[in-house]
Amino acid sequence: MRSRSNSGVRLDSYARLVQQTILCHQNPVTGLLPASYDQKDAWVRDNVYSILAVWGLGLAYRKNADRDEDKAKAYELEQSVVKLMRGLLHCMIRQVDKVESFKYSQSTKDSLHAKYNTKTCATVVGDDQWGHLQLDATSVYLLFLAQMTASGLHIIHSLDEVNFIQNLVFYIEAAYKTADFGIWERGDKTNQGISELNASSVGMAKAALEALDELDLFGVKGGPQSVIHVLADEVQHCQSILNSLLPRASTSKEVDASLLSVISFPAFAVEDSKLVEITKQEIITKLQGRYGCCRFLRDGYKTPKEDPNRLYYEPAELKLFENIECEWPLFWTYFILDGVFSGNAEQVQEYREALEAVLIKGKNGVPLLPELYSVPPDKVDEEYQNPHTVDRVPMGKLPHMWGQSLYILGSLMAEGFLAPGEIDPLNRRFSTVPKPDVVVQVSILAETEEIKAILKDKGINVETIAEVYPIRVQPARILSHIYSSLGCNNRMKLSGRPYRHMGVLGTSKLYDIRKTIFTFTPQFIDQQQFYLALDNKMIVEMLRTDLSYLCSRWRMTGQPTITFPISQTMLDEDGTSLNSSILAALRKMQDGYFGGARIQTGKLSEFLTTSCCTHLSFMDPGPEGKLYSEDYDDNYDELESGDWMDGYNSTSTARCGDEVARYLDHLLAHTAPHPKLAPASQKGGLNRFRAAVQTTCDLMSLVTKAKELHVQNVHMYLPTKLFQASRPSLNLLDSSHPSQEDQVPTVRVEVHLPRDQSGEVDFQALVLQLKETSSLQEQADILYMLYTMKGPDWDTELYEEGSATVRELLTELYGKVGKIRHWGLIRYISGILRKKVEALDEACTDLLSHQKHLTVGLPPEPREKTISAPLPYEALTRLIEEACEGDMNISILTQEIMVYLAMYMRTQPGLFAEMFRLRIGLIIQVMATELAHSLRCSAEEATEGLMNLSPSAMKNLLHHILSGKEFGVERSVRPTDSNVSPAISIHEIGAVGATKTERTGIMQLKSEIKQVEFRRLSISTESQPNGGHSLGADLMSPSFLSPGTSVTPSSGSFPGHHTSKDSRQGQWQRRRRLDGALNRVPIGFYQKVWKVLQKCHGLSVEGFVLPSSTTREMTPGEIKFSVHVESVLNRVPQPEYRQLLVEAILVLTMLADIEIHSIGSIIAVEKIVHIANDLFLQEQKTLGADDIMLAKDPASGICTLLYDSAPSGRFGTMTYLSKAAATYVQEFLPHSICAMQ
């Protein structure tokens, strides 16, 4: 018999430690571990972490086996791990109905439970009796399921279980937009059951998704059916949100020690090494103590000041927990593991020694790791005064199995029994290693032979869609439908993946479906979804964005491949040449660079060997039967004649026997419109409407047609007015100016509706006119009246065979209008159809997840609706319609702006610095205002032009508003002199950092608006011979530009085209209006407000108080505090007035820095502003200013000249605000300071 080696003896000692502290508690039937002797429930997260020591020890025995008994011991340990993992699987699979429901609802009531009965795997508390939604717990289970499977363990035994795991992937893939209760089961730190977005959950979900992607759950014994599929776009959503959250942990926790599990073992979810180090140092600096780390600041758990009889905390109570938070040795085990994986031996040694000092020796000298160390009740005051000086006492579970397990695992690795690669077989530890440069492969395809010839004339040789066969080309929406079959299991009542928008990472791969290669075109060129794809310049911008995104986010094997089809809509109006924007983009891609990305153009067949290709094994024939329903319509050749897919579908009859081809053709046939209207004539309709860029609704045409048809009560059928509050009343019978702004508009037209013999309305007259007219505008007018009077599903019986509902006809008309790029009419029909961005909820989520709250509608509340958490698609669109008061035009424009904001958030996040709330209603308002100012035109002309802008021009205008570069003003923390606000400086700014399109954007806008004005005048003279007038003002009135006030010279009206004035006049007022509308504040503003609240009882803004008690609940760096401050400031409807209030608060922060105890009780900030205004008026009058120069804004009572004053200088706003603040608070200041003032 061989003698036992030293390593074997040491392993035996760890085996005894594992047995005595962990395995002795494992249930022999279920394999689950109870939390402690007193708490018999099994928590999912704790169980996974607690078994890691057993898994590691088993790997160590297998690696260092001296004899057969060691191999047997390794097998025994590994099977204990399998038993626990399968026990947890049984617990969760019993709740399969919740998994199915949660995929669609993301509701806390539909979530998997966080803990189960150790003996039976049953649930132990009700759905609403615990914070069950903890995505990090489900994610850590999936992460280690992947790691353990990769290490050789066989945990999953059947395809039913594979499908369940696939659905768990769908369960966690929305973690980036799902607020949960987090790793500490508390949600918001007030412990009141408020869920929030947690970085620990997002990071762990991201790690689990990456680990499971393309993993065979049967290991080496598996096949295609047991492979898990993950969509790369969902992973990157998590990555993006995680990067934006860190080093913060959530909205209520500015830092949390649980982030150690995200930036290091086990998740390794962060790819930016600098961000990893920043987060790590934040934890060490703010949370580390003598016995471990606090979980987060002001954590009251098991502190002497916590009331054990009460589950929740009062908000102001959190201040009591400051500096006495319990310290957890658990987190030092993470630092040990981090040191091992990073190769930092010094860190490993330091924390091992520190941990040894806080371990408690149990029976027979067994080292036990306590749950936490708490301040003794009699030493609380001493700890308050001198943090980290009082000796603490151990409390809670002993041992804390989670911490005990990681302590043993860290010791095994530190002593060399395990290498990092053995405990991390999927190589997640290399996440921060720089990735190779990405070259995006672009295959340009022509829809038809004619387009191919046009491209060839330009020196661009391409293939047609038909010529790439047997490679098959499909639109992105088809890939979304295909993925909806993934994970489907009828026996378990699992429906598969919910239908969702397909991102660019998903469409940039090739797909192997039943031995046939498929490629999918990007989502943004699908013209059936939203009208952005009808604008060729917008297509180029979206292509540029996607290419840039691919270069920074692509992490898969192989290069990304974009299939870019050139369709008929990308040609000029005559159809003989390529649109200049598209041609320029193609030439740049051929040159090798576009949008900052390296490009390789070529044929699809040339890219087969270098592309990333995924085998969609779930599309193979399986136990679930066929891919499609037997009752679908086999007539799949009815695609629209203008659809770019025609080149591909021409071969469809040759492959009717192919089930996949029939399935895909079925999807195409049911997602494409079928033409039913008569084609537009070239003479009477198309050419005229090409030239006629009119108002969004072209209400005049509607009324004219109503007169011809003798329609009564036309006002009942007109589109709802844009933000009806404070709207002018218009009389359509004459051209008088608007009057009585506060009245709801009415229309009085004395006409008669045709009736049949029985006296009923004869709608057949309308339908007959619809059939005969070739004018697109007239068709829209008639369909709108039918839509409002008969409903969208009314069958017009336009043709004998088949139905022709109003909705179907409007959809077809939308396609026709799109071809002539009539943007006002496009938006109008989109509004009628309630046509929404398919990825609207994703755009909203992108913004929210970057900690930007959204509001829709115009202030004040309750009209302005706040969106502070991700919403399901339908709920989001309902909220937008409600906020827009049913106005379909503004509803559709709000969605459009939301998409553009999300685009800029992904590509230029710096535009949104120090902005926590994006008020889309105000942004639309300020866009119209700025357009009027830039073009020196009236508000009516500007608002009409805004609704007729192309999407690309609208996006450029938004960039102009966000960047503010035209004004040569920016926010800065370094003042140019002592009197300047620390947040504002003036200097010349170039166009560095903007794209060429954005640099020339405003010039294009001016040109486009001038054309709109010319066409509007032409239409008013040609199309309205009866003296009618254009109703541009009816869509977006002056009251929309300045809510609550009329547009007068004192409130921001703009001169006409021929008025000249000093370009500097109005510059600062415009700057303040922009910053106020965008909620932009100086750097560090919210932290300074927190300090001010420490010196007073609160700040009052327009009667709404921000109390000082807020600081007892929230810390300075919390997002929650920033949002709370924003909610008070947003009570002010006028952007420029709001910005003056911000400047006044900045002055108060300077006073708060003085060494005094208090600067007042409740400080009325608006009063300080009005005192400053009075001082300004007095001084201006002494200098000879007259009443006209010193006109006041009627809404706020502030002199417009003060709004337009620079912050610095003798007459600067900061000068007067400083004097006003000193005057207001002087009674609270020491006499010596008052004398200095």
UniProtKB/Swiss-Prot annotation:
Membrane protein topology class: Lipid-anchor
Main location, first listed in the record: membrane
Site (Not methylated): 1234
GO annotation, cellular component aspect: phosphorylase kinase complex; plasma membrane
Record GO biological process: glycogen metabolic process
Protein name: Phosphorylase b kinase regulatory subunit alpha, skeletal muscle isoform
A Pfam family this chain is assigned to: KPBB_C
Coiled coil: none
GO MF term (any one): calmodulin binding
Summary of the tissues where the protein is detected: Isoform 1 predominates in muscle, heart, brain and testis. Isoforms 1 and 2 are expressed in similar quantities in the other tissues. Isoform 3 is highly expressed in slow muscle and heart.
Residue numbers of Phosphoserine PTMs: 629, 729, 735, 758, 972, 981, 985, 1007, 1018, 1020, 1023, 1030, 1127
Post-translational modification remark: Phosphorylation of Ser-1018 by PKA stimulates the dephosphorylation of the beta subunit and, thus, reverses the initial stimulation of PHK by the faster beta-subunit phosphorylation by PKA, that occurs in muscle in response to adrenaline.
Residue ranges, compositional bias (Low complexity): 1042-1056
Cellular compartment(s): Cell membrane
SUPFAM superfamilies the UniProt entry points to: Six-hairpin glycosidases
Control of this protein's activity: By phosphorylation of various serine residues and by calcium.
Sequence similarity: Belongs to the phosphorylase b kinase regulatory chain family.
Entry function: Phosphorylase b kinase catalyzes the phosphorylation of serine in certain substrates, including troponin I. The alpha chain may bind calmodulin.
S-farnesyl cysteine: lipidated positions: 1234
Region Calmodulin-binding: start-end pairs: 810-840, 1060-1100
Pathway(s) this gene product operates in, as recorded in its UniProt entry: Glycan biosynthesis; glycogen metabolism
Key words, A-Z: Calmodulin-binding, Carbohydrate metabolism, Cell membrane, Glycogen metabolism, Lipoprotein, Membrane, Muscle protein, Phosphoprotein, Prenylation
UniProt subunit comment: Hexadecamer of 4 heterotetramers, each composed of alpha, beta, gamma, and delta subunits. Alpha (PHKA1 or PHKA2) and beta (PHKB) are regulatory subunits, gamma (PHKG1 or PHKG2) is the catalytic subunit, and delta is calmodulin.
Keyword Membrane: yes
Region named Disordered: 1021-1069
